[in-house]
Amino acid sequence: MTTETFVKDVKPGLKNLSVLFIVLETGRVTKTKDGHEVRTCKVADKTGTINISVWDEVGNFIQPGDIIRLTKGYASLFKGCLTLYTGRGGDLQKIGEFCMVYSEVPNFSEPNPEYTAQQSQNKQAQAESGTGTNNHNSSSPAPPAPDLDNGNGSNSSGPSTNQSTAPAHSTSGRITRSQPNHSLPGAPNSVSNGKEPRRTGKR
């Protein structure tokens, strides 16, 4: 059995995560080139907030106030922002509504210069190793550099906590839908106030 991970402990590259959170905001649907629907939701627990990318019809069932358990999730960087995803064989299970203590700060999905610098170093190292291996016999190309776990670098100075006073409903629904185990460009990278900037294709 996987132990629960708090939002503050989520780092890029972690896999098989089990996270319990409340949905604060649901983002607009974005369509990928291959027809998938992607929605970014802002979620929180008592340690802070993070974005989760939800694929296809599962996003239609998620509403603000839902308390959800993510199982077999993973964390990755999307445009320099830490984001949760449902892994292969993982799911999102609604276990309640409204009554959960959460903190809106710190937001661990805000762009982090430490992560951005690490991604740049990884890309540079990959480019250098790619040119160096061209002179040697190599049976396969170098794999992409993984996101390294180097801490979140966020400063949480006295997070505020909120607790909703609405009664809890004894609803328990299961939202199951595995998504591809990869992140695609085009998903919004943050949810701020429910209004997201329009995204366009690669330029």
Curated annotation (Swiss-Prot):
Protein source organism: Xenopus laevis
Keyword DNA damage belongs to the record: yes
Gene Ontology cellular component terms for the protein in this record: nucleus; SOSS complex
Protein name: SOSS complex subunit B1-B
GO MF annotation, one: single-stranded DNA binding
Any one of the GO BP annotations: double-strand break repair via homologous recombination
Chief location of this protein within or outside the cell: nucleus
Residue numbers spanned by region Disordered: 110-203
Subunit details: Component of the SOSS complex, composed of soss-b (soss-b1/nabp2 or soss-b2/nabp1), soss-a/ints3 and soss-c/inip. SOSS complexes containing soss-b1/nabp2 are more abundant than complexes containing soss-b2/nabp1.
Top-level lineage group: Eukaryota
Biased composition (Low complexity): 129-140
DNA-binding region(s) in UniProt: 22-92
